[in-house]
Every structure is written in C-alpha cells, then in structure tokens.
Amino acid sequence: CNLECKYCGYGEFYSNYDRRETGDQAFENVKLLVDYLTKLWCSDYNVSHKNEITIGFYGGEPLLNMKLVKETIAYIESLNLPSLIFNYNTTTNAMLLDRYMDYLVEKNFSILISLDGNEVQSAYRVDKHGNSSFSRVVRNVKKLQETYPDYFEKKVNFNSVLHNLNSVAECYYSIKELFGKNPRMAQLNTTGLIPERVEEFSKM
C-alpha cells in the first residue's frame, strides 16, 4: 500500500502487523486461478441465470499493481467466453486514480473510494511519511468526476471508517458536499488487536 493509515487492520495496533511491502501478486498465480474457475463457470455448477461473474481487485492498494489488473482482464477477454458477463470492481485510496481512470472507465469498473470525510476527519489517512493524503485524493476524485460525470454518478461510491475524528453525520455531510454521494460507513476493526495497545486504540 502507498498509505499508512493509523487504523489499518494490518497496522501497528494488530497482532498480524504487516507493512504491506511483500511485493506484487504474480500473473501466473492469477492465471491458474482463472483457469480453474473458468471450468466451474462453464459447468453445471454455475446456476446463475444471468451468468454474471464479478472480479474484485483489492489490496493493499490495487492500483499499485495495474500491470496485473490489465493482464488479468486481457487474459479473461482472450478466453472468448460469450456466455459469461464479466464485471470488475476495485477498492482504492484514489492516490493513483488520475493515472488509471481512463482504463477503469473503459472497463466499466465499479469503484469504492476510501475517504473518511473532510481533511480533519480524514487525518488518520496518511502516507508513509505521515503526510495527509486528503488534498491529492480529492484532486484525483474531482478529476474523475469532471471528466466522466455520468460514469461517476453510476459507478463510484465511497467508504468512510468511523473513529474519534468524525461521526456518521459528519461523514455523510462531508462526502455529500464534496462529491454529491452518500458514503457507506464501517467501524474500526477490533479483531486481532495487540492486548497492550487496546487502551491506546480505544481512544481513536
């Protein structure tokens, strides 16, 4: 990931602490999985009346590995499976959204953007040097909204994490004011907290 959010479920408060620097997933692994699943998708096990398949790209930050995303989709398209409808989605911090938005729009991705409200409410969402990510994220998301307004209206949503710097009402009104959207909301993850850090974490 290119951020180091203070409350990250893989962060310093958790027993499964992982700096998320273990490298990118390899296309060879994805190809094996797609080949295996294709046999199931094209078999009697697939009882979906629409034959729709949704593939999600999640991280870490998936836009850091756009090479893999593009390779995966190109491979799926090369399989020539006209009986199946493929949909794609991703959850992103939007730090690299300006670089890749044209491709995401071309492939009609559903995008879930992580943002906790305004700049104060999003203060836990910092980069590796402790700097706020807010201005860059808003700039990138605004660029997407202005360049592809219809797509933005239909395919882009927001997820806000609730903590001591915001509230349900504050998240709602901030995202609504910034982008005209109603955000989804999630609570802080309390699973796997290091016992010695619970009291400190509880103040967030």
Give the residues covered by each predicted segment:
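Radical SAM enzyme [4Fe-4S]-AdoMet core and its adjacent flexible, acidic
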Residues: 125-138, 142, 146-204
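A short acidic, amphipathic alpha-helical/loop segment
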Residues: 71, 99-103, 170-174
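A short helix-to-beta-strand connector/capping loop
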Residues: 51, 84-86, 107, 151-154
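Conserved radical SAM core fold
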Residues: 14-15, 62-64, 94-98, 110-131, ...
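Glycine-enriched alpha-helix->loop->beta-strand junction motifs that scaffold or abut catalytic
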Residues: 105-111, 178-182
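Conserved alpha-helical substructure of the radical SAM core
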Residues: 3-99
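Active-site cores of enzymes that catalyze phosphoryl transfer or operate on phosphate-rich substrates
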Residues: 1-7, 133, 137
